[in-house]
Amino acid sequence: MSSQCRSAALRLLKTRPRSVGEVEAKLKDKEFASGDIAEAVEYLKEMCYLDDRAFTVGWIRYRLARPFGFQRIIRELKEKGVAEGIIADAVAAAREEHPEETTAKALAQRKAERLSGIDPLKRKKRVLDFLLRRGFPMDAAYKAIKNI
């Protein structure tokens, strides 16, 4: 049964990188024994197929390219079962390279241009809501819509 669990875990990793928590949850959903799951996860870690630090850095890079704010990225990583310490380290490094206010301003400008035919107050509200859904903090979102 352990080899079936290991095979299922490898199939999960074929589609996209995953966190340890995601792999464990998916294998539990497939009703594998917890001992088999632990064995499979340990094997994948030894083979360097599972690494939460690398997954976190990659996920942050992927989501910043979309662009999303750090609040949403952090929430997504927690949902994926990544440890808070790993998230905090990776986010701290990424914040230095990608200031949220700059990203929020550029994104707000692009969104406002698409909403050019709308009443200015409604446009600001829609852009603000958009930025907040994207995970930008309230203060960065307000600064971004100030000159729209």
Where are these regions (language model features)?
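An alpha-helical, amphipathic repeat domain used for nucleic-acid recognition
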Residues: 1-148
